[in-house]
Amino acid sequence: MYQDLIRNELTEAADVLNKFLSDDHNIAQIEAAAKMIAESFKQDGKVLSCGNGGSHCDAMHFAEELTGRYRENRPGYAGIAISDPSHLSCVSNDFGYDYVFSRYVEAVGRKGDVLFGLSTSGNSGNILKAIEAAKAKGMKTIALTGKDGGKMAGLADVEIRVPHFGYADRIQEVHIKIIHIIIQLIEKEME
């Protein structure tokens, strides 16, 4: 009954991934992001990750696989998702939702750390402010975006953009693949 719908959804997902794969710049940016994070870890730095909605879940997943493990046992890496409910609700209430990530970056981020921000539109105000706060602290910045990169286009040190203009879930599907590859490359860099 739904077999055509299922095939169409999987075909569209594959098409989005194949379009992303066809641009060598995307592959180079993934490698650059992994090397940037590994270099920070080698200098006792950390990565702070943030996003909204499904991207927030991806930011937490990224941090969890850094501190826990990806595929193989290895020492944990300093990955922190900006996801503490008391922090998020306090800052949202007292300063506004646009500041939930930047306030954390200002408090916890240090020169040499990395901010890893996810926004499928590239227009999330709170991620933009987090990138600005990270740069002010001397941190490196990585943005996972979609569509045309939105306001984040060209703002981060490394931007990895999924150029899909349909629903955000297709962008998120590629983002999670990128996250897993970045972790795999970090592990190789840290050997």
Curated annotation (Swiss-Prot):
Pathway(s) of this molecule: Carbohydrate biosynthesis; D-glycero-D-manno-heptose 7-phosphate biosynthesis; D-glycero-alpha-D-manno-heptose 7-phosphate and D-glycero-beta-D-manno-heptose 7-phosphate from sedoheptulose 7-phosphate: step 1/1; Bacterial outer membrane biogenesis; LPS core biosynthesis
Cofactor (UniProt): Zn(2+)
Residues annotated to bind substrate: 52-54, 65, 93-94, 119-121, 124, 172
Keywords: Carbohydrate metabolism, Cytoplasm, Isomerase, Lipopolysaccharide biosynthesis, Metal-binding, Zinc
One Gene Ontology CC term in the entry: cytoplasm
Localisation: Cytoplasm
Domain spans labelled SIS: 37-191
Primary role: Catalyzes the isomerization of sedoheptulose 7-phosphate in D-glycero-D-manno-heptose 7-phosphate.
Family recorded in the similarity comment: Belongs to the SIS family. GmhA subfamily.
Protein's recorded name: Phosphoheptose isomerase
Gene designation: gmhA
